[in-house]
């Protein structure tokens, strides 16, 4: 199963309001395993953006940009300030690693 299919399924599940972690083949579960730079480098900029924002969505973040609002529902969100989103140690590290790979790839 490729990352795109897993992201699509995860996006559908995220809209259910369930506060659960997303797990990705080749990466692991975003709230209990560290993603590796090597594994993340296999993804596209779009996939990296989606995985990173899924972490914020599952933790209650209300997206501000039109792109994110169109990709992720703000239904059930309750945190407007991204800095106030409580991420566990795995999620924080995974977001940082994703951002590092996005930067190295020149993602916008």
Regions flagged by a language model, labelled:
Residues 1-7:
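Bacterial N-terminal signal peptides that target proteins for export
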Residues 8-12:
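Hydrophobic helical h-region of N-terminal Sec-dependent signal peptides
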Residues 15-18:
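N-terminal signal peptide c-region/cleavage motif recognized by signal peptidases
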Residues 27-37, 77-82:
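Acidic/histidine-rich, surface-exposed loop or edge segments in extracytoplasmic proteins
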Residues 39-73, 77-78:
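Amphipathic alpha-helical packing elements
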Residues 63-108:
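Compact alpha-helical subdomains of small soluble proteins
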